[in-house]
């Protein structure tokens, strides 16, 4: 999979793209990330990418010309999405990450200042948000999306079965995890996890998932309930 990221701050991505599973996935060519600075597509000597908003108002708006030029300079692979990072977009979730793994190319446009000129939306096939809040830049949600999608690609995570059992893969939160020692400062590992009874362990984990989800995320619990077959 190819990620083409339009960003005014390419250095923002340097460390995360070289670290952990993400760095290893890029080394193994499971995915590639191409960083494009819209300033390289400006035509004035000051390399200006923003201007004042028509109609007045606070802040600056990213101009359409460098964004159009940057996107149009990219090769077009067979299955491509052009995604604008914006607070007005579709909130990210695990289902979105899974859907995006079906594409060959994701072009990510990182907003900044007061946002991008509305005409940029003519290039866009999807708008995506990190959540119901405003950040200083679109690089943070873009990096989140890159991480969330790449970790689902075959070969990124060593034990791919762990992707099935983790939080949100079934609308349930993850169950509690324990490792050695069996007792730490008076806190003991639940006996069922030491029993060797795999059926009992699986049942305990499901019960813990259901309890956690019901208590912490009633919205997800309702989705889980709605998906269960009628008795």
Swiss-Prot record:
Matching CDD domains: TrmD-like
Location relative to the cell: Cytoplasm
GO molecular function, one term: tRNA (guanine(37)-N1)-methyltransferase activity
UniProt-annotated binding residues for S-adenosyl-L-methionine: 111, 130-135
Domain of life (superkingdom): Bacteria
GO terms of biological process kind: tRNA N1-guanine methylation
Region annotated Disordered, chain positions: 210-231
InterPro entries: Alpha/beta_knot_MTases, tRNA_m1G_MeTrfase_C_sf, tRNA_m1G_MeTrfase_TrmD, tRNA_m1G_MTases_N, tRNA_MeTrfase_TRMD/TRM10
Pfam families per record: tRNA_m1G_MT
Principal subcellular localization: cytoplasm
Name of the top EC class for this enzyme: transferase
Keywords from the named record: Cytoplasm, Methyltransferase, S-adenosyl-L-methionine, Transferase, tRNA processing
Catalytic reaction annotation: guanosine(37) in tRNA + S-adenosyl-L-methionine = N(1)-methylguanosine(37) in tRNA + S-adenosyl-L-homocysteine + H(+)
E.C. designation(s): 2.1.1.228
GO CC annotation terms, alphabetical: cytosol
Quaternary structure (record): Homodimer.
Family that this chain belongs to: Belongs to the RNA methyltransferase TrmD family.
PANTHER family reported in the protein's UniProt record: TRNA (GUANINE-N(1)-)-METHYLTRANSFERASE
Known function: Specifically methylates guanosine-37 in various tRNAs.
Annotated protein name in UniProt: tRNA (guanine-N(1)-)-methyltransferase
Organism: Synechocystis sp. (strain ATCC 27184 / PCC 6803 / Kazusa)
């Amino acid at each position: 999979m190819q990620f083409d990221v339009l960003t005014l701050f390419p250095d923002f991505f340097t460390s995360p793209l070289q670290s952990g599973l993400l760095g290893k996935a890029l080394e193994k060519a499971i995915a590639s990330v191409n960083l494009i600075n819209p300033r390289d597509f400006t035509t004035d000597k000051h390399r200006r990418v923003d201007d004042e908003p028509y109609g007045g108002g606070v802040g600056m708006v990213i101009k359409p010309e460098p964004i159009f030029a940057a996107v149009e300079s990219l090769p077009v692979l067979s299955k491509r999405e052009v995604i604008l990072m914006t607070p007005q977009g579709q909130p990210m979730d695990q289902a979105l990450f899974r859907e995006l793994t079906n594409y060959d190319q994701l072009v990510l446009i990182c907003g900044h200042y007061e946002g991008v000129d509305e005409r940029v939306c003519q290039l866009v096939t999807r708008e995506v948000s990190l959540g119901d809040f405003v950040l200083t830049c679109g690089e943070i949600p873009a990096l989140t999306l890159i991480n969330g999608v790449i970790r689902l690609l075959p070969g990124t995570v060593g034990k791919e079965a762990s992707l099935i059992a983790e939080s949100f893969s079934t609308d349930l939160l993850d169950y509690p995890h324990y490792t050695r020692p069996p007792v730490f400062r008076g806190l003991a590992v639940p006996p069922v996890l030491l029993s060797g009874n795999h059926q009992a362990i699986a049942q305990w984990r499901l019960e813990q998932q259901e309890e956690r989800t019901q208590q912490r995320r009633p919205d997800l619990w309702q989705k889980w309930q709605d998906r269960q077959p009628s008795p």
